[in-house]
C-alpha cells in the first residue's frame, strides 16, 4: 500500500483527503508504485522561499517544490516530499479565478509527477508530463482550464 502523509504546518483550510487522492491518482494512473510513502507539506510563503533560495538559488516563494528521495535498500520506498506554499497557491487561484481545492490538487499532481522523474524542461518532456497531468486531473474532476496557471509559476524540482 502507498501512504501519503499531509503535514498542514499552519492549520490552513485544506481538504486533506483530496490532496492524498491527487497523489494516489497519479501513482495509480501511471502504475508507478504500489508500495511506498511520500509527504505533502502545506506551509507558508516564507518557508517555501527559504527552500527555494537554498536548493534552487531563487530568492522568492513559489507554488510547489518537489524533493525526490532515494530509499535505502530494505526500507519502504520513499518517493519524496512536496512542499506547497498555501498563501501563494491561494493568491494564484484567486488571480486565475479557480477554486483553491482544485488548485491545490493540481499542485499535488504536478509535484508528484516531478517526484516520479517527469519534467517540462524540453518541449517533448513537457508534452509527456502535461499528458500525464491531464489524465490525472480528469480522473479527479479538476477542470483542465486550470493548467495554464502553472505556466506563470516557478516550481521546478530543486537541485542538490
Language model features by range: what are they?
Residues 1-103, 116-160:
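An acidic/histidine-cluster motif and surrounding catalytic segment
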Residues 109, 113-114:
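Short active-site segment of divalent metal-dependent hydrolases/proteases
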Residues 104-108:
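Beta-strand elements within well-structured catalytic alpha/beta cores of enzymes
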Amino acid at each position: 500500500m502507498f501512504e501519503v502523509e499531509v503535514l498542514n504546518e499552519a492549520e490552513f483550510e485544506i481538504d486533506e483527503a483530496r490532496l492524498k487522492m491527487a497523489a494516489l491518482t497519479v501513482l495509480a494512473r501511471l502504475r508507478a508504485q504500489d508500495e511506498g510513502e511520500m509527504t505533502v507539506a502545506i506551509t507558508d510563503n516564507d518557508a517555501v522561499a527559504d527552500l527555494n533560495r537554498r536548493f534552487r538559488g531563487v530568492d522568492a516563494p513559489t507554488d510547489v517544490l518537489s524533493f525526490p528521495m532515494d530509499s535505502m535498500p530494505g526500507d519502504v520506498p520513499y518517493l519524496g516530499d512536496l512542499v506547497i506554499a498555501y498563501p501563494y497557491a491561494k493568491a494564484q487561484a484567486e488571480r486565475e479565478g479557480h477554486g483553491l481545492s482544485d488548485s491545490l490538487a493540481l499542485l499535488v499532481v504536478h509535484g508528484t509527477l516531478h517526484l516520479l522523474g517527469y519534467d517540462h524542461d524540453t518541449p517533448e518532456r513537457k508534452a509527456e508530463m502535461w499528458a500525464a497531468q491531464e489524465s490525472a486531473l480528469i480522473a479527479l474532476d479538476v477542470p483542465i482550464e486550470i493548467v495554464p496557471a502553472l505556466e506563470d509559476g516557478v516550481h521546478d524540482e530543486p537541485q542538490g
